[in-house]
């Protein structure tokens, strides 16, 4: 390592100058050290995103970090002014803590108040917050240099005024910063820089301002230049071949050595020395927190005194008020606890209060208590708990959680360990729809700048960087896609392997030999690979963390973190990412939006409307056999956490019969336990196939709920405590070490465990064997507290599906109404439950899916789900609200009645058209075709009616005021055009609903598609194993063709419909050519392979077959994740009209010589399979057929008893 005392880089862009700077901080730190430099600055564009990452990385390498930013500044006194787009660059550096806080404030205001294309500050703000800050005139875009550079035509055009103006501005900055303003010169070989060089030196002599020499550094090594260009192209959506793209004219923007800089500035060595002067002035030391030596400051509730006074109490501090609320809450909870156990609860509570108080976390607990209290008061659904907090009795007493930790043997030490100082971490689930209200409450309570969400940085990871770079290099789409798919689907995969803790972790290069073959045989692929290696893991863009929120009740957040404004949400976000918030003394709270809570809330509201019942989940019978029967059947679509194919199979195998079993299912249903044999042990022991044995009798109470199998982390802790004599705090530390596979700690503690066991009178060898067993399963162990809390939601949803299936499934459909494929899937599930879904209609539909009673063929009332108007694409909330409000006065009797009553200032042509196309205005006197042809006439009539109403009610018309508006109905002059053909109707329905109502495009091909076995449904694609072969039958609805920019070859996508929904396939030239030989107006069979792309199952097309060719192929069974589903023999595609299907009649076709005995068998079967479909007999006699209606109502399962016969659906 060389040593340098004369130069510090003061103009440097890291990876946090998103896709402009390409200096990866960890690599940068090593390079600075290698070049012998003792200090370095960061000046990212307009932000401080990377300040703490930079600070800690440089400190680790023994380099002095200088925190700065290259600010954007404009000259309007109104910071938020949009009058001018002109902005200049100015480099700012924090000298000390005051300067650092001022810098954070300036950066925050640039985003929150000054943002206009870029985050901007102005000189007024700069004057007010300049203390502790050093500034320099920046690059050619700096204001001083801009006016000096009259050689540049663009500068002259936009107002560059020359030397005198530049000097005036320099003196203005000198007046603001005094001796801490420096003139900056750069020498990259750019003509404009040479033009201003002498003028800057002249200005320095005339003003006494010192000069610093800088290099506008955007990447680390000289050979990184091209990769940085590629990154810029990714940011702008350009390719390297695009003309006029933004690019550097020279390749000099790398980390130059002190020697290189000395050579460049040999004529002005003081410019180098002055960089060191700035470095010496900067003495900032950031007080970073860590759990061990310098723990973060626990947050204060701040409102304790006011809250206590409201309750007529007197508490001055958080601790005493917290203890009071916890004890008060426990008294309420103990009402449902047997009296003989009260003392146990009180002792546990006091122990927890003591630990929380000693660790100084009462304020934290009160903050959480308060926002959950508010949510519940406002009727915002809150989850029963999440994570390790469910193990705390205090949390249960404060109603932060709703799971009794003593009842389910949950451990407080899993939440807070008194032997290891770490911040509590309570994650809270809220109704997804209303989560925003809780954030708004926090902002209102603590202050606009005291609450913020947390920034995230999306990185260019292995697959993504290949795709990005391939696009920039104009690689044909299919080649790029194939290249990216070579990257193995493995969590945390990197392009090349690396060493970690002495272990070599293989990357894609080592795992997939085809990558090497491709890179060595294809020049473009080689370039893609090389640039991708350079850019991998670079920050791509900024986002917002899905859950995290930080709160400081004492002062504005910019004292600890600069702030950022999210373009997506408009909300305030920290500039520091999650990893760096605790070090700067900020504690995060997680507010998660859980869709299931919204579904439950909607279901409860429908139940209240339908039955006037308030379901109380806290008083449910947790041993209800009907609920467990639902779960055991595998009928778990819509049931929280256990609805996937894998869980359905697990439910059938395990057959849960207690709440403890549900807790275990959630813990077991993960790849680790499934692959380790834990699940087999659990199932076999539960059902008596294997004996339950305990190595020590003391283990029975710990392992009995899981049939002798170690399933939970808490069990590991209890075993270590009970057999080895450890405290639960020590046991928690061992659990953590096992999770991290820390070999040394585990080896040390094994000896301690065995010795402890011996001291307690246990056999040492048996203890050693037990330790090895613990180590084996600890890696798969799950947090029981989390599992128990989520099992509560599982039970609640299973209860609703068992007892209120119509209401529950209506709520499920509402939750998915913006996802076509999901609606199709759930409607399929509704059909399986023999629930009829009525199409949307203005006289029966609400905003959301709802439940209503209709008379059936026998005149009996029957519950059905009604399609929600909100699920009709393109209508909008306001028109629907108006339609429903007006309908409360009575159903719409005709189209004229509808027009005369609805407000057409809200119902526009754009909203009316999807209502007509979806069938929502059927039975109002006109066909859809007629209404669609007369949309303008209908809207004109509606607006004319609105205008007339306005005049009549105005009080100043010729007729005076008419109460109630126009009483006469609108008269329409529309010619009946008949109805569209079936194909057009179906297309309109699919366009507006995402599904077909009046039939299915495959209906006309029913006979042709009979008899195929083992076809995969589109809704089951996610249930298939990756790598499995799948055959799907469907009809192509649309083909979108494109031409590859570079290859010039055609490619495209096809939207394909089967009886269950839609799926998409990528088509390349070969497949597009194949389609030209096929009749795409008929169903086709698609041979595909299941691949994983970005953790989602995708179909890769191999072959397209017409039906005739497909019949000659022996279609193999697809491989499902659920072994039970694998056993199914998928035969004919069942008839499926997605809506109102159960009202269709079912007919069995018989020959005219049918025997009476056979008819008796049919009747017995019909009585066994009673349902809602009228049963007909079709008797064939030569070329004639006779249809006979029976008095029997059946379901689909009757077909299974007579598989050899023909069945038909009758409208």
Swiss-Prot record:
Subunit text: DNA polymerase III contains a core (composed of alpha, epsilon and theta chains) that associates with a tau subunit. This core dimerizes to form the PolIII' complex. PolIII' associates with the gamma complex (composed of gamma, delta, delta', psi and chi chains) and with the beta chain to form the complete DNA polymerase III complex.
Enzymatic reactions: DNA(n) + a 2'-deoxyribonucleoside 5'-triphosphate = DNA(n+1) + diphosphate
Gene designation per UniProt: dnaE
Protein name, UniProt field: DNA polymerase III subunit alpha
GO molecular function per UniProt: 3'-5' exonuclease activity; DNA-directed DNA polymerase activity
Family the UniProt entry places it in: Belongs to the DNA polymerase type-C family. DnaE subfamily.
Location in or out of the cell: Cytoplasm
One of the GO BP terms on file: DNA replication
Predominant location category: cytoplasm
């Amino acid at each position: 390592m060389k040593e340098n005392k004369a130069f510090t880089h003061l103009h440097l862009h890291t990876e946090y100058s998103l896709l402009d700077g390409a200096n990866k901080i960890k690599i940068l730190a090593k390079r600075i050290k290698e070049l012998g430099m003792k200090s370095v600055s960061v000046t990212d564009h307009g932000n401080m995103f990377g300040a703490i990452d930079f600070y800690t990385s440089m400190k680790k390498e023994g380099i002095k970090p200088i925190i700065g930013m290259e600010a954007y500044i404009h000259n309007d006194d109104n910071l938020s002014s949009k009058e001018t787009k002109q902005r200049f660059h100015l480099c700012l550096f924090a000298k000390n803590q005051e300067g650092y806080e001022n810098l954070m404030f300036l950066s925050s205001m640039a985003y929150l108040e000054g943002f206009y294309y870029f985050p901007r500050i102005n000189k007024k703000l700069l004057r007010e917050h300049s203390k502790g800050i050093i500034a320099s005139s920046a690059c050619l875009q700096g204001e001083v240099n801009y006016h000096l550079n009259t050689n540049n035509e663009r500068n002259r055009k936009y107002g560059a005024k020359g030397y005198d103006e530049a000097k005036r501005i320099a003196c203005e900055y000198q007046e603001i910063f005094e001796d801490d303003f420096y003139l900056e010169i750069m020498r990259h070989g750019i003509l404009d820089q040479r033009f201003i060089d002498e003028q800057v030196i002249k200005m320095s002599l005339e003003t006494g301002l010192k000069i610093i020499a800088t290099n506008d550094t955007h990447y680390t090594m000289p050979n990184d230049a091209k990769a940085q260009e590629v990154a810029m192209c990714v940011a702008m959506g350009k390719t390297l071949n695009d003309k006029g793209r933004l690019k550097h004219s020279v390749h000099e923007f790398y980390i130059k050595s002190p020697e290189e800089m000395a050579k460049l500035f040999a004529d002005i060595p003081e410019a180098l020395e002055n960089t060191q002067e700035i470095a010496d002035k900067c003495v900032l030391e950031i007080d970073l927190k860590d759990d061990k030596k310098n723990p973060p400051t626990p947050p204060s509730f701040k409102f304790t005194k006011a809250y206590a006074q409201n309750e007529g109490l007197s508490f001055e501090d958080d601790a005493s008020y917290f203890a009071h609320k916890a004890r008060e809450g426990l008294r309420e909870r103990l009402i449902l606890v047997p009296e003989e156990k009260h003392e146990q609860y009180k002792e546990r509570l006091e122990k927890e209060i003591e630990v929380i108080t000693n660790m100084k976390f009462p304020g934290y607990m009160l903050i959480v208590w308060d926002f959950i209290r508010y949510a519940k008061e406002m009727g915002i659904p809150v989850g029963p708990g999440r994570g390790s907090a469910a193990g705390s009795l205090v949390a249960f007493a404060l109603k932060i959680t709703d799971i009794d930790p003593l009842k389910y043997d949950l451990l407080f030490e899993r939440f807070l360990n008194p032997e290891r100082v770490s911040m509590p971490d309570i994650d809270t689930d809220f109704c997804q729809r209303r989560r925003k209200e809780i954030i708004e409450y926090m902002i209102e309570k603590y202050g606009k700048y005291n609450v913020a969400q947390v920034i995230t940085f999306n990185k260019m990871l292995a697959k993504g960087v290949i795709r990005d770079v391939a696009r920039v290099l104009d690689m044909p789409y299919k080649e790029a896609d194939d290249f990216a798919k070579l990257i193995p689907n493995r969590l945390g995969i990197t392009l090349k392997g690396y060493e970690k803790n002495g272990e070599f972790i293989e990357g894609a290069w080592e795992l997939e030999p085809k990558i090497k073959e491709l890179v060595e045989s294809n020049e473009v692929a080689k370039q893609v690979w090389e640039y991708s290696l350079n850019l991998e893991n670079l920050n791509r863009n900024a986002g917002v963390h899905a859950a995290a929120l930080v709160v400081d009740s004492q002062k504005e957040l910019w004292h600890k973190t600069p702030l950022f404004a999210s373009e997506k949400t408009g909300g305030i976000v920290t500039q520091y990412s999650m990893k760096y918030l605790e070090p700067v003394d900020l504690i995060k709270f997680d507010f998660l939006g859980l869709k299931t809570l919204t579904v439950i809330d909607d279901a409860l509201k429908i139940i209240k409307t339908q039955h006037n019942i308030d379901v109380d989940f806290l008083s449910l019978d947790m041993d209800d056999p009907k609920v467990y029967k639902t779960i055991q059947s595998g009928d778990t679509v819509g049931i929280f956490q256990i609805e996937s194919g894998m869980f359905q199979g697990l439910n059938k195998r395990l057959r849960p019969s207690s709440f403890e079993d549900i807790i275990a299912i959630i813990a077991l249903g993960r790849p680790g336990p499934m692959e380790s044999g834990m699940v087999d042990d659990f199932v076999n022991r539960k059902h008596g196939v294997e004996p339950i044995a305990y190595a020590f009798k003391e283990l029975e109470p710990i392992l009995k709920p899981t049939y002798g199998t170690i399933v939970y982390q808490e069990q590991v802790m209890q075993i270590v405590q009970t057999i080895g004599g450890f405290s639960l705090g020590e046991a928690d530390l061992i659990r953590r070490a096992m999770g991290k596979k820390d070999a040394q700690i585990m080896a040390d503690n094994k000896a301690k465990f065995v010795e402890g066991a011996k001291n307690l009178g246990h056999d040492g060898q048996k203890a050693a064997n037990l330790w090895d067993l613990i180590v084996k399963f600890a890696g798969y162990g799950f947090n029981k507290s989390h599992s128990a809390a989520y099992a509560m939601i599982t039970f609640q949803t299973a209860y609703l599906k068992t007892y209120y299936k119509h209401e529950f499934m209506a709520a499920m459909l509402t939750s998915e109404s913006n996802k076509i494929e999901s609606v199709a899937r759930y409607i399929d599930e509704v059909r399986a439950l023999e629930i009829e879904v009525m199409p949307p209609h203005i006289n029966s539909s609400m905003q959301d899916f709802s439940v209503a009673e209709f008379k059936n063929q026998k005149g009996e009332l029957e519950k059905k789900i009604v399609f929600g108007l909100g699920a009709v694409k393109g209508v909008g909330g306001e028109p629907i609200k108006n339609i429903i409000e007006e309908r409360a006065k009575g159903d719409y009797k005709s189209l004229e009645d509808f027009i005369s009553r609805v407000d057409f200032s809200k119902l526009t042509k754009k909203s009316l058209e999807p209502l007509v196309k979806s069938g929502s205005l059927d039975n109002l006197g006109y066909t859809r075709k007629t209404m669609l042809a007369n949309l303008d006439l209908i809207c004109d009539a509606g607006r004319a009616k609105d205008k007339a109403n306005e005049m009549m009610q105005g009080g100043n018309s010729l007729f005076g005021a008419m109460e109630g508006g126009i009483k006469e109905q609108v008269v329409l002059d529309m010619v009946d055009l008949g109805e569209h053909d079936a194909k057009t109707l179906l297309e309109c329905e699919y366009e507006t609903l995402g599904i077909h109502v009046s039939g299915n495009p495959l209906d006309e091909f029913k006979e042709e598609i009979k008899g195929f076995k083992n076809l995969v449904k589109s809704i089951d694609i996610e249930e298939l194993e990756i790598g499995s072969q799948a055959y799907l039958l469907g009809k192509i609805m649309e083909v979108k063709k494109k031409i590859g920019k570079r290859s010039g070859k055609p490619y495209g996508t096809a939207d394909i419909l089967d009886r269950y929904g839609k799926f998409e396939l990528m088509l390349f030239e070969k497949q597009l050519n194949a389609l030209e030989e096929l009749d795409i107006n008929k169903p086709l069979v698609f041979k595909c392979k299941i691949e994983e792309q970005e953790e989602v199952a995708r179909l890769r097309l191999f072959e397209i077959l017409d039906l005739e060719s497909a019949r000659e192929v022996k279609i193999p069974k697809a491989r499902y994740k659920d072994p039970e589903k694998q056993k199914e023999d998928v035969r004919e595609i069942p008839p499926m009209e997605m809506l109102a299907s159960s009202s269709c009649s079912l007919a069995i076709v018989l020959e005219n010589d049918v025997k009476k005995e056979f008819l008796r068998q049919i009747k017995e079967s019909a009585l066994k399979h009673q349902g809602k479909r009228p049963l007909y007999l079709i008797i064939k006699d030569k070329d004639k057929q006779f249809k006979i209606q029976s008095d029997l109502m059946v379901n689909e399962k009757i077909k299974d008893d007579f598989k050899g016969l023909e069945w038909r659906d009758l409208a």
